[in-house]
Amino acid sequence: MLERLLDFVLGVWARISDRTISWTRLPFLMALAAIIGHRVNLRHHNLIDTETAPPDLSGRKIDGLPEDFDPREFRMPDGSYNDMKSPWMGMAGARFGRNVALSKGFAERDTELLSPNPREVSRKLMERKEFVPVESLNVMAAAWIQFMVHDWLGHGANDPKRKIEIPVQDDDLWPPNREPNAPNGPMNVLATGADPSRTDADEGRPVTFRNVETHWWDASQVYGSSWARMERMRREGGKRSGARLENGKFWVDERGLLPLDEDMQEKRPKQELSGVNGNWWIGLSLLHTLFTREHNAIVDRLRIDHPNASGEWLFQKARLVNAALIAKIHTVEWTPALMDSDVGRMAMRGNFYGLSGERLAKGFGLVSDSEVVAGIPGTPTDHHGSPYAMTEEFTAVYRLHALLPDQFEFRSSDDDRVLFERNLTGVAFGQARTVYDGATFDDALYSLSTQPPGAMVLHNFPNTLRNLSKKPEEGVFMDLAAVDILRDRERGVPRYCAFREALGMPKITSFEELTSVEADQKLLREVYGTIDRVDLLIGCMAEFQSSRQPKGFGFSDTAFRIFILMASRRLKSDRFFSTDFTPEIYTPAGYSWVQSNGFRDVIRRHSPALAPHFDDVRNVFYPWDRAG
């Protein structure tokens, strides 16, 4: 009763403060109260279920899954049975939910879909003229969020039978490889794969899409979202024909590197294998390798206390621990690095430790069932009235491609001398593995940890990704910036002003209010005509350079509202982070591993020689100290 009353008061305070003065201008305690109040309001109004006919999993068999596999003790490979009463919830193949009312979530069609032209939006507002860095962060911060997104979501293969044709202007040299004097364009983009589960019950409702990965924060980017995928990485050389490791570990080679993906070698030579290995680059290679090694280290620790346990038991318990550690790192390290202010750090770390703080949590364990007091882990599971799911709006605000540089410099971790340089193409897909031919794993990790990522502002989208070769032999290229704009429209994500309205935020009424940069005000007016037409991604990047931008934040306040809601939801809805985050489920050693370790410890464990470079750095997502 008391907590409900507190929620009511905080919710009212959040609405009042939003109408009068932004929380970003309030004193610490008042700002923190407003942020918590925004979460209360968003939970009440912005968790929307899209399922109309959830699947019945009774009697289902998964090939290869041991008969004694207990979903109460372990995470199911496909994410099912996290919620024992609704076992389909959050599993791979379940629909994306929404963070806006269904009436606000209809996809744009026909001329609206291409108005204004996504390619022209890319050219005039997103093209990187010169690299705008974030000097307070390192490139591993950019790699980390892609590592997380691959855990949470994927829309799967596009529909080869449905093409969206984007016209190009006469002065637009597209595609990049066209013959001299050949006609321009158009740019053809495959439509997002349709949802085959729609029935008559979906008539008159917005378009839906299915998540091909599990919705849960279960490290599926490392472990995969199916038993078959998980099995491949437990076999010699990552080959289906390889001998299975029965010790509970992943297979790594003699250098501790990942196996190569046997299915991809013809198309993408040297492409590495992991749970999710799409859109691969050296930053992902480093993180997947680190947490594959971390899994094996956790297995070694668990075996000390459980010498007679089977390899399967060790593997699945280690997965629980590894996934929880990754979630903790994101919550208390990565997110505060991107929200580098007193209130931002407290708000996000509070998801894990509550207002009582880290020291009390580590010293006395769970001191309250209140998530505000003690943090979410260990408190009762709560879906807040809507089945758990990742959402289309969450996908939209995590379009953070501007964080990526176009150029990389690889240097020795011993003396900082330059070993070689590569562009983004030269470190992507199978080329990522070739980095280790001229630099050690430690050198590569050191190099990315001492270089800055890009800022989430206009005119800073990587040009490599704006001229991306998909099938160059067939003349198929892609402008990912234009595709980002198109996807939000295609999937029914409201445009910037409508999005803010759907979240209960104050209305932006002019381009001058949107951004403080006069040149961008002019360009935005030229491209969009009216403020209501501005796309969500463009609005968020423009907002970054305004008086409303939260101090120390790496993204806009508009995007932050979704983070407030969904960061807590990923923990609170997940049984293994809430009710079952206990020593009994994780084992005492596993539970302690999560509580006592962070990203700094993971790196020190697997690359101990790098410790002097980050020992004096407050957060390992900040730039490390240079060698020499």
Where do the model's predicted regions map?
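N-terminal accessory/cap region of cofactor-dependent oxidoreductases and related radical enzymes
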Residues: 1-297, 301, 320, 324-482, ...
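Extracellular/luminal domains of secretory-pathway glycoproteins
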Residues: 506-510
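Mobile, glycine-rich extracellular loop/lid and propeptide segments
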Residues: 303, 311-314
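Residue-level "edge-of-site" marker
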Residues: 500, 513
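Alpha-helical scaffold segments that form or flank carboxylate-/histidine-based iron centers
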Residues: 314-320
